[in-house]
């Protein structure tokens, strides 16, 4: 059974190789012109620095190689199948070229300076089905050989160049891909590549211009975009590109709804083939009431993280044309043409309006059906009145019936006659007067002539 090994500071010009169960680097070891190789069967703790021409770290599947010791090497090879490498806590790692083939193992590594993912011996690029997290504190990360991940999580691959820089600081730290070199992901996974400058990286070529898989003004801490990432590979820049905006004036009719935004706003200055990103509000300001408003389109294009050069447009909300309709009631003839009406309108249901009129008249006072009723002097008032206009219309019309008035006639008498063989009767109407007619229901002022016909019950 292999024993545990503690490396207590070995400084040579020759190669160093350590094989044991668990290995602890307790003091700095150096072989600057040759190689250091650590082969373990258990966990490896790197608590002090290692400095070599080529540094190789391996252990058994399921074990962990970790520590705060600074790793300095021209070539850094990780080839432990299934080994988990946690090497992102040291502050002064200085690796020139990194290559890894680790099977199901996870790899987290942060270099203090620029480094390259390349080829070391028989290992080219990085191959893993675990999670991959690479970072440089400052400096570029150059991807010269392919990175292949079969991990299926939302953090399958994270590459972050210039991690010490904040969003909007696009200096010193870009991810640069060699010609034809790619990051290959599982279809269910998400990968994120954080880079600084649009001009000094090659993400558009590798990810694909026009794919919509780019975000801006963001880093691993600050997220200035709101359009969520789905599966696939994304390029996330610290740089904040700026769009110029232009907008046409907008006129809308009052409808009780807030102005949702100016869909005529156009933008120029897109990068990476982006088109029509989600512009927050398009200059919306929740304006509802009639009036004229100056609105500024500004702020960030929240979907992707762009900034916008402000522009102005005028919003005019015109009053809604109020259409007042009337319904008239049927009435019994009363000698006048006065009508009784109810008013209604096309106002917004939740608005407060009071409708009024100064007169409603039938075409004449006489009984009849479907008689025209004219309603004049239309007006309205109320808390919402300023949002409406009659547009010069002051009257409306409808129809209704005037039914005949029932008349009770008294004062008619039958005249006596000599038998003449028939039942014909004659009547005396002299007892019918205006007074008796009015008392019987005639409208005062009307004139009626009463006549009567009839017959005896027998001859």
Which residues are covered by each model-predicted region?
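Short loop/turn motifs that initiate or flank beta-strands
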Residues: 2, 57-60, 70-71, 78-81, ...
